[in-house]
């Protein structure tokens, strides 16, 4: 069995003035083997056009992985190598780690904005 990796996916609930609106990430925690493909889901109910995936490593601030300004629009951030995203609707921006590596062990955050 290959080396196991632990991915901590932070559940990030953002406040935008709507009590029933939210942004959710899943799974909340993920352990996988090196080389496996991993997908982290991000779903928002605000109907925001802009969505973002960040990672935060020990001793560092947030670093942008990928972002989207609307359906079918995806862009690379500063640390996009080894990751991909897709945006087939307004609500979702899944992040895929193509081949999990120990260098991708991190806390992941999804965010959205108008």
Swiss-Prot record:
Keyword Transferase: no
Cystines in this chain: 42-110
Keywords: Adaptive immunity, Cell membrane, Disulfide bond, Immunity, Immunoglobulin domain, Membrane, Receptor, Signal, T cell receptor
A Gene Ontology biological process term: adaptive immune response
Main localization category: membrane
Highest taxon above the source species: Eukaryota
Domain Ig-like: 22-114
Pfam families: V-set
Signal peptide: 1-21
Location relative to the cell: Cell membrane
GO CC, any one term: plasma membrane
Key word Cell membrane present: yes
InterPro entries: Ig-like_dom, Ig-like_dom_sf, Ig-like_fold, Ig_V-set, TCR_beta_variable
Parts forming coiled coils: none
SUPFAM superfamilies: Immunoglobulin (SSF48726)
Function: V region of the variable domain of T cell receptor (TR) beta chain that participates in the antigen recognition. Alpha-beta T cell receptors are antigen specific receptors which are essential to the immune response and are present on the cell surface of T lymphocytes. Recognize peptide-major histocompatibility (MH) (pMH) complexes that are displayed by antigen presenting cells (APC), a prerequisite for efficient T cell adaptive immunity against pathogens.
Assembly and binders: Alpha-beta TR is a heterodimer composed of an alpha and beta chain; disulfide-linked. The alpha-beta TR is associated with the transmembrane signaling CD3 coreceptor proteins to form the TR-CD3 (TcR or TCR). The assembly of alpha-beta TR heterodimers with CD3 occurs in the endoplasmic reticulum where a single alpha-beta TR heterodimer associates with one CD3D-CD3E heterodimer, one CD3G-CD3E heterodimer and one CD247 homodimer forming a stable octameric structure. CD3D-CD3E and CD3G-CD3E heterodimers preferentially associate with TR alpha and TR beta chains, respectively.
Protein name per its UniProtKB record: T cell receptor beta variable 10-1
The organism of origin for this protein: Homo sapiens (Human)
Organismal lineage: Eukaryota, Metazoa, Chordata, Craniata, Vertebrata
